[in-house]
C-alpha cells in the first residue's frame, strides 16, 4: 500500500490525545500492576535483547504506533529500498548499503544491473591488499614492514572506521591504526609526529578526491613522506578509497591501490564498503567479514520480521513516540562499554544528518518535529558528568543503554559485573525515582535532626518516570558490532519514513562549505570583507589583528 496521509494524520492525533491522557501514569505503578510488562515490551534476536518496558507506553500506545507504521507504509518503503529503487529522491539514487553486506548468491539490482558481483570484487581486492600489508608482503619503499596506518577522511569516511576500529580493539593483530579528520593542522601534526614514514601507510578516503579537509591533510602527509623518503616513495606509502582515478593518479597513488564504491552508498552508511579498509587491515579480512555478517543478519530480520516482532521497527517507533508525541528533543546514547566510546558520535551523524530535515519528500514544510539531538558518552563516565541533569533536571531526555553480558578480560570479570550493575541501576533509578517521603525516611535513618531532614529532603527527591531502553548482547565482537550498527541504521530509516522525509541526503552540510570557500581569501588577507555582515567583518578584523600581534 502507499503512504496514507489522512490515516497518518488521524493516528498522530490519536497518539497525542493518548499521551495527554496517559502521561500522568506512574511507571512504578505500571510495573507493580503488570508482572508481564517486561515480556510484552521486549524482543530478542538471538542473543540481542531490546527492552523498552521502562518507556512510558502501554498496550494502546503500541497498537497505535503499529497503526502509524502501517499508515506510513514502512513496509512498502522498506521493500523499495531492498529492491534498489531510487528512494533518495533529491539525488535520484538508490540506497543500498544493505548490498555491501549481502553475501548471498541472489541478485540485487540497481537500474537493472546486479551489483553483488561488483561488491564482492572490491571486497576481495580489499582482503588481498589487507593481507599483503598485514603479512609484510606489501612493504614500504625502503623494504620495511608497515607498522602503522593513518586514515585521512572526514564525516562518514572517518566516524565509522574510527568507531569500529576502537570497538574491535581485542581483535587487532595488524598494524596500529590512526585517524586524521580535522582541518586543524594540530590533528595531523600530532598524529604523524611519533610515526616513521618508512613504516607508515596512509589511506586517503574521499570519493571525489576533492574534499577540502581530506585533501589538505593528504597533501601534508604526502609532503611528510616525500621529504623523508623521496617522491618515488609516495606510491608505496599511500592507498586511496575513491572513484576519481584521474585525481588519484595525479596524486601519485597506483591504480592497484585504489578502492572504489558507488553513489548508492551514502557516506554515513559506508563503513561496510572500501571506507572500512583501515578496519579490515587492523582486524583482518575474516573478522571484517564477520562484521558484515552481523549487519546482514539484522538486514534479513528487518526485511522479513513482522512489524510487531521487528527490532529496528520497534526501536524506530519508540524513537518517534519520544520525539514527535512526547516532545523530547534529545536522545542520549550511553554504551556501558569503553570500546564503544565513539559510538555516540557515530550515531549522532547517522541520525542527525539523516533526519535533521524540515521539508517532506515532496518539498513541503513538515508538520511537526523531526530528528532529535543525539549525544552521549560511555558509562560509567557519564554518571559523573551529566547524569545529574538526566535524573533531576527540568528536561526529560530518553536514554538508550547498551551493555554486553560478557567482557573480553576474564581476569577483570568483577569489574564487568560492576559495569553491568551500574547500567541496570541507572535505568531503574530513572524509572523509579525517589519520593519526598522516601527521601525523608532515608535521612531520618541517619538520625538527623528533623529540621535538617526537612531542609535537605527536597533536594534528594527524584521525579522518576524518566524513560530509557536497554540493548544487551553477549559480547562486543565483530558480528555483534555489525548487527548493532545495522539496527540503528534501520531505526533511522523507520523514523524518517514516519516523518515523511528523505534520510539519505544532507544538503544542510553544503552551505557552510560554500561560504568557507568564499571566506578563505578573506581570512588569509587576500580579499577584503566588504559585503559581509557586520559580525563577520568584525570577526575577520579581530582575527587579522591578533595574528599580527
Curated annotation (Swiss-Prot):
Pathway: Carbohydrate biosynthesis; gluconeogenesis; Carbohydrate degradation; glycolysis; D-glyceraldehyde 3-phosphate and glycerone phosphate from D-glucose: step 2/4. One of its GO terms (cellular component) is cytosol. It holds the Pfam family PGI. Its main location: cytoplasm. The keyword Acetylation does not apply. GO terms for biological process: gluconeogenesis; glucose 6-phosphate metabolic process; glycolytic process. It is found in: Cytoplasm. CDD domains: SIS_PGI_1 (cd05015), SIS_PGI_2 (cd05016). Coiled coil: none annotated. The active site is at residues 353, 384, 513. Its EC number is 5.3.1.9. One of its GO terms (molecular function) is carbohydrate derivative binding. Keywords: Cytoplasm, Gluconeogenesis, Glycolysis, Isomerase. It catalyses: alpha-D-glucose 6-phosphate = beta-D-fructose 6-phosphate. Catalyzes the reversible isomerization of glucose-6-phosphate to fructose-6-phosphate. Belongs to the GPI family. This is Glucose-6-phosphate isomerase. The gene is pgi.
Amino acid at each position: 500500500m502507499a503512504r496514507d496521509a489522512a490515516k497518518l494524520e488521524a493516528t498522530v492525533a490519536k497518539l497525542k490525545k493518548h499521551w495527554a491522557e496517559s502521561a500522568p501514569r506512574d511507571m512504578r505503578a505500571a510495573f507493580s500492576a503488570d508482572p508481564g510488562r517486561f515480556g510484552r515490551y521486549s524482543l530478542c534476536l538471538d542473543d540481542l535483547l531490546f527492552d523498552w518496558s521502562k518507556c512510558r507506553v502501554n498496550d494502546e500506545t503500541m497498537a497505535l504506533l503499529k497503526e502509524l507504521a502501517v499508515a506510513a507504509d514502512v513496509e512498502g518503503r522498506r521493500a523499495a529500498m531492498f529492491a534498489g529503487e531510487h528512494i533518495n529522491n533529491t539525488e535520484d539514487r538508490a540506497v543500498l548499503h544493505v548490498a555491501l553486506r549481502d553475501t548471498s548468491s541472489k541478485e540485487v539490482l540497481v537500474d537493472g544491473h546486479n551489483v553483488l558481483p561488483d561488491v564482492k570484487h572490491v571486497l576481495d581486492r580489499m582482503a588481498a591488499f589487507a593481507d599483503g600489508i598485514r603479512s609484510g608482503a606489501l612493504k614500504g619503499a625502503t623494504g620495511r614492514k608497515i607498522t602503522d596506518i593513518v586514515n585521512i577522511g572526514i564525516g562518514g569516511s572517518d566516524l565509522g572506521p574510527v568507531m569500529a576500529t576502537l570497538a574491535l580493539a581485542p581483535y587487532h593483530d595488524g598494524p596500529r591504526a590512526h585517524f586524521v579528520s580535522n582541518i586543524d593542522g594540530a590533528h595531523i601534526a600530532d598524529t604523524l609526529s611519533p610515526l616513521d614514514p618508512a613504516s607508515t601507510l596512509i589511506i586517503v578516503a574521499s570519493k571525489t578526491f576533492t574534499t577540502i579537509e581530506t585533501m589538505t591533510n593528504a597533501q601534508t602527509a604526502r609532503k611528510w613522506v616525500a621529504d623523508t623518503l623521496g617522491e618515488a616513495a609516495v606510491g608505496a606509502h599511500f592507498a586511496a578509497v575513491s572513484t576519481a582515478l584521474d585525481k588519484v593518479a595525479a596524486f601519485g597513488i597506483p591504480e592497484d591501490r585504489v578502492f572504489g564504491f558507488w553513489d548508492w552508498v551514502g557516506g554515513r552508511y559506508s563503513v561496510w564498503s572500501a571506507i572500512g579498509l583501515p578496519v579490515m587491515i587492523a582486524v583482518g579480512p575474516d573478522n571484517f567479514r564477520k562484521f558484515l555478517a552481523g549487519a546482514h543478519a539484522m538486514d534479513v530480520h528487518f526485511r522479513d520480521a513482522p512489524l510487531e516482532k521487528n527490532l529496528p521497527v520497534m526501536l524506530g517507533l519508540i524513537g518517534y513516540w519520544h520525539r514527535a508525541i512526547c516532545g523530547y528533543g534529545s536522545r542520549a546514547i550511553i554504551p556501558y562499554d569503553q570500546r564503544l566510546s565513539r559510538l555516540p558520535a557515530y550515531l549522532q551523524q547517522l541520525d542527525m544528518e539523516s533526519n535533521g530535515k524540515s521539508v517532506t519528500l515532496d518539498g513541503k514544510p513538515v508538520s511537526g518535529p523531526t530528528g532529535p539531538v543525539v549525544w552521549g558518552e560511555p558509562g560509567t563516565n557519564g554518571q559523573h558528568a551529566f547524569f545529574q541533569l538526566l535524573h533531576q533536571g527540568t528536561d526529560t531526555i530518553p536514554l538508550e543503554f547498551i551493555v554486553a553480558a560478557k567482557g573480553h578480560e576474564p581476569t577483570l570479570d568483577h569489574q564487568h559485573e560492576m559495569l553491568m550493575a551500574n547500567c541496570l541501576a541507572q535505568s531503574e533509578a530513572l524509572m523509579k525515582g525517589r519520593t519526598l517521603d522516601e527521601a525523608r525516611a532515608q535521612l531520618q535513618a541517619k538520625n538527623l535532626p528533623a529540621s535538617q531532614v526537612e531542609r535537605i529532603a527536597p533536594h534528594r527527591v527524584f521525579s522518576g518516570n524518566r524513560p530509557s531502553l536497554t540493548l544487551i548482547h553477549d559480547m562486543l565482537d565483530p558480528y555483534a558490532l555489525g548487527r548493532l550498527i545495522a539496527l540503528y541504521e534501520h531505526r533511522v530509516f523507520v523514523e524518517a519514513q514516519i516523518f515523511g522525509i528523505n534520510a539519505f541526503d544532507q544538503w544542510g552540510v553544503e552551505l557552510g562549505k560554500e561560504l568557507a570557500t568564499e571566506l578563505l581569501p578573506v581570512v588569509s588577507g587576500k580579499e577584503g570583507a566588504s559585503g559581509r555582515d557586520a559580525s563577520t567583518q568584525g570577526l575577520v578584523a579581530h582575527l587579522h589583528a591578533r595574528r599580527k600581534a
